[in-house]
């Protein structure tokens, strides 16, 4: 192998917003800040959060139906 062509690896910490710290190695020489990790992501924890989208769907349907009505009037 040739010398001095491989990147240097540093031991860093990936810090999640929930407080979980994940030690890892990277060529990046600084710590990473994560939004979610396996300790707090709903898929891994099994705690699914239901979002009430009824208002959003109704608003979309209302806008969409108005645009269809307007296009039919122009024809």
Curated annotation (Swiss-Prot):
GO terms for biological process: translation. One of its GO terms (cellular component) is ribonucleoprotein complex. PROSITE patterns: RIBOSOMAL_L31 (PS01143). InterPro entries: Ribosomal_bL28/bL31-like_sf (IPR034704), Ribosomal_bL31 (IPR002150), Ribosomal_bL31_A (IPR027491), Ribosomal_bL31_sf (IPR042105). Keywords: Metal-binding, Ribonucleoprotein, Ribosomal protein, RNA-binding, rRNA-binding, Zinc. GO terms for molecular function: metal ion binding; rRNA binding; structural constituent of ribosome. Disulfide bonds: none annotated. The keyword Zinc applies. Binds 1 zinc ion per subunit. Its cofactor is Zn(2+). Zn(2+) binds at residues 16, 18, 37, 40. It comes from the Bacteria. Belongs to the bacterial ribosomal protein bL31 family. Type A subfamily. Binds the 23S rRNA. Part of the 50S ribosomal subunit. This is Large ribosomal subunit protein bL31.
């Amino acid at each position: 192998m040739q010398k001095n062509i491989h990147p240097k690896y540093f031991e860093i910490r990936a810090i999640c917003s929930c407080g979980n710290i994940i030690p890892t190695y990277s060529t990046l020489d600084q710590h990473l800040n994560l939004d979610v990790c396996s300790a707090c992501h709903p898929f891994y924890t099994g705690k699914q959060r239901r979002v009430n989208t009824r208002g959003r769907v109704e608003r979309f349907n209302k806008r969409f139906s108005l645009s269809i009505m307007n296009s039919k009037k122009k024809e």
